Amino acid sequence: MYTIGQVSAMFGLPVSTLRYYDKEGFFPNLERKGNIRYFSDNELEALRIIECLKKSGLEIKDIKQFFVWVSEGSSSYEKRKELFEARKSAVETKIQELQKTLSLLKFKCWYYETAMKDGNEDSINAMLPDKLPENIQKLYDKGHE
């Protein structure tokens, strides 16, 4: 069993967030002794799922719906799987977008490092758009997809 302060430290979440989740009903079996909340491994796993879904872009109301489905048992397996498939797809799309952004950022770092070394952009511009060094060309191409 863990106190709210311990869980806050474990997950890097403010205590206020944990209280909010509790108030929203995410921890229906949370043990209380006096005014102190005690989190079991079940609550920790629920918190991992909440944070995973939240980081995937799902809103709290939709995360609550997931937990309603969990309470329905095996009859909601398909809905839960579809939710996770959709979130996985959304995260994969976001990763692709970020990879494109990262490629362009890396290209521009090389671009300005080279321009500073040369004192101008002439040699770089002469190589654009398709005569760059191979590794830099890949970054340029990915960033300009």
Predicted regions span which residues?
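Short, charged recognition helix plus adjacent turn
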Residues: 64-86
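Helix-centric, low-specificity signal for extended rod-like, repetitive segments
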Residues: 12, 41, 47, 73, ...
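A broad detector of the eukaryotic-type serine/threonine protein kinase catalytic domain
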Residues: 49, 68-71, 89-92, 96
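A generic structural signal for secondary-structure junctions
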Residues: 52-55, 68-71, 110, 114-117
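C-terminal regulatory/oligomerization modules of transcriptional regulators
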Residues: 78-145
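Residues at alpha-helix boundaries and short interhelical turns
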Residues: 54-57, 74, 95, 99
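Residue-level recognition of short, well-ordered coil/turn positions
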Residues: 26, 58, 74-75, 120
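Basic helix-turn-helix/winged-helix DNA-binding cores
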Residues: 1-68
